Amino acid sequence: MTSLMSNENEEKDAEKVDQAIEMISAGQGPEAHKLLMEVIKNTPEKYDIKIEKYGNFFIRFWDQAEFVHYVNYGSEEKDEGDISWIPNTYPRAFYFIGFLYMQIKDFPRAVAAFEEGQRLDPGHPMFHLEKAQAYYQMGAFDKALSEYEMVKGVGLRVSEDRYAAALRGRGIVQIETGDLDSAEAVLKESLEYDPGNNIALHELGYIDHLRKGRHTGQSTMVETGDGTLRPEHKEKPKKRKHFFWKA
């Protein structure tokens, strides 16, 4: 395993990232941030997500769900030979640093962290989903929509639930910009990938209310890439709730 690591520190750094994730779950944000900052000091300039060695492929997956999706996804893009899971360390570290900045509403720094992670792991959809969320919070709806649109469909690295989340995000941004027809279309499309999703159904109901002139205003809650809810930073009257990720 050591020969597959990007540097001599990576095995220990991967363990630190896992520890930081547990800290975040336990509400220990400052402690997690400190640990993640130690990790990113060792970030290599080049970081290979897929390594071919011994006639097999070693891929840096974020979690077991990604690994299972990749192995089971039927695509001509997939490599022949055995596929093994090795730790994804530095992109994940930047992702969770960005996540912590999102929690304290420091959206510009969150975007910067996500972009650093994306530089190392450009094919991962979570960076687009979270950057879109940050731009949405800053009121940069065009940029938010553009990030969601970068998740173009289900693929080797994009599961059905993440593509559905991108479609829901597009729909929510389009509701805010008044493009109700487009929002309705993508929200309905999202249900093809995540049938019965309460978020999509809620937003479709809200579109119906808007068309009937029953409600106005923006959300009080928005949903981040990992399924947690955050209060919206803008204080405006007559707010509603909406969500991006999962029910």
Question: Where are the regions that the model predicts?
Answer:
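TPR-repeat structural position
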Residues: 29-30, 107, 141, 180
